[in-house]
Amino acid sequence: MILYHGTDIDSALDILNHGLDAAKLTALQLERPTQLGPGWYAAYEPEVAWFFASLAPGNVGRGYTVIAIDIPDDVLNQLVAARQAIRNAIVNVPFGAQQYWFDLRAFEVLNTHTTFRPYAGQEPSHG
């Protein structure tokens, strides 16, 4: 399955080069609202990821982007069964969309069994 994560440029480069880092993510999410608590969020559609990338705290003056995550179905199913991944509707946004939330405990599995890559698509026009 391909999922999409929107973030600022520096965070995207860090994920692409080093994988997910629970300590860094925890520091970034400190005192920031999250729908399901601390963890990593990935959307089904790249357009949704672009929306959240534009809201990333590190994007001001630096830019933002979307990365694609290729996660094998069996790995995703294993994480769901272990309650380390939850699929749910995104709330408090002006559109309907689905996402996966990944618990910090899932990062080792994600870093080992998934492929993170730059998303080649362009940000959708809002005009």
Residue ranges of predicted features:
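Short aromatic-glycine-(Arg/Gly/Cys) micro-motifs in beta-strand/loop hairpins
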Residues: 10-34
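Histidine-centered active-site/metal-ligand motif
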Residues: 5
